[in-house]
Amino acid sequence: MLWCSLSVFIGLSAISQGGVTRFIPGILVSTTILFYLIVIRANSVTYSSLKQFNTKTGVLSIASSAGTLCCVADTIYHMVMKSGAISKLMSKGISTTTIQAVVVIALLTMSFIAMYGVSVIFNYILSNVVALIDTIIDNKYEINNIVAIVVCALYFFLIVWVYRNTTAFYGSGYNDVIYGSDSYTLTGSNVWLSLFQGQNDLRQPLYMLTAAPFMGIAYILGIILNCFYVNGLAIAYAFVQALLLVWSIWLLSHLISNNDIIRSLIILILSVSYPAIVFSLCLEQYVSSFFWLIMAVVAVMYDQKKADLMIIGAANGLLTSAFMVVWKRAKSFVEWFQSAFKCGMMFLLTLFAFGRADIFLNIKANLAEIFQHTGKKLTIVDKAYQYSKFVVDCFVGQPAVEKVHKSGFLIWGSSESTTINVAGVIIIVLIVIAIIWNRESLLCKISASWIGFSVLLLCVLGWGTSSNALFLYSLYFSWAFWVPFFLSIQRIYNKGYKKSAIVILTCLFILIAKFNIAEFIRMLNFAIENYPL
């Protein structure tokens, strides 16, 4: 039943993206692998754990799977009704009502069959996420939980107000409007719920599996909100995205400190950092990728048994997150290599099991498209200019500029970097000092490696520099720059300078909020003026 259900889902997902033909090789490989894993190895430990229904997450899993399949079915319905075959049937005297009824019944039947398999997968993912989070929850601390809830509520109010006044952050009719984001395409194609959507390429091979367990419920919420707002679905997506963002920040605060007040201040500071403010509104893939990356960090620090699952989830959300595999614990290099190799094979098996063999069958074209973003025409010095500015962007919003896109519409983006950013260099020096001071901390080591990875990816390789759009990656990397600083404040607190530590964080919160809210208002004025609802 599970094999049949998942096979139907993969087939429906392929049809929703324009037909099965180009996905046939992947689907054949997928059904074969699933048949082996589910039918032949029906008594395996993995299969048994997959089918365990977790009551904590079961209802959410069912709701998210229902939302995901509603989205897929709705896409197929409109595709079928606009096809030439329908016109031919109507010309033969078959009424539109009859055709609609047949199509709806067929889609409902297939969706019902697929729902079982999707619910099982979503439940497996969510139950492991919740179980991992439970390992770091300390019930005696409550203020930081209240702070996180308040921040989330403020984000919700902000989303509703902004989305009622502008379309710039989700549906302006153009991509690149806000800091080079593809929000328009992502929202219009429901990228979070689409297994084969074009944006879910080699960079995010199984992005849907990491996002849909959360975003599926947003689709159902969006249907309800559409009764009150013309952009109800976008608001629902933004709600869940903001929830994942705050959840990630809350997790980071728990990794950094065991003090309730310090945790609360960390949540407040990170919530008003410029990347967090922008991505609380801008519908993008990076928020859920950021969430899964933090989950991978939690796993390698607290539960190595779940490390493989979280690293695979993070890598499917954004392939570069596979870098976290270097932090898998082992007694020797050989043991680590075997463990990393096993994780890599599991990643590929998951990829093929869910029909994404097409990514490797078209690997040359996929790589060519990806490497066009690397700024091959720029010198290493030009890339360093942009990177030094990017470091500052991870903390505060620098004055952005209104520009004219090459296609003629107005966009809001980073100003050109023609020299080294002094503030960025100062921050890097301070971060290096903080890393040295906290070098015994595993979290500090992980964040230091992630900073080094950002230098390699953004500065040396020059990812995103061709379009001067490094800000898009600020949320994904900024946490690593913040961690050594917060760990230093925690050490100051532990040494007995409690008031000093709290005063430093409080002043920093006020300062960061002042700068970032001012820049945010400038961006908002641009959005409302040029892209009103």
Where are these regions (language model features)?
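Specific aromatic-rich, kink-prone transmembrane helix
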Residues: 276, 288-305
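Transmembrane-helix motifs of polytopic, lipid-linked glycan transferases
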Residues: 236-257, 433
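Short hydrophobic/aromatic helix or loop-helix immediately within or flanking a transmembrane segment
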Residues: 196-229, 235, 239
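Membrane-interface alpha helices of multi-pass inner-membrane proteins
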Residues: 305-335, 339, 507
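Short acidic/glycine- and proline-prone juxtamembrane loop motifs at membrane-interface regions
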Residues: 281-287
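Transmembrane-helix signature of polytopic, membrane-embedded enzymes
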Residues: 250-272, 445
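Membrane-lumen/periplasm interface segments of specific transmembrane helices
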Residues: 158-163, 337-423
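Hydrophobic, aromatic-rich transmembrane alpha-helices
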Residues: 124, 128-131, 250-253, 400-409, ...
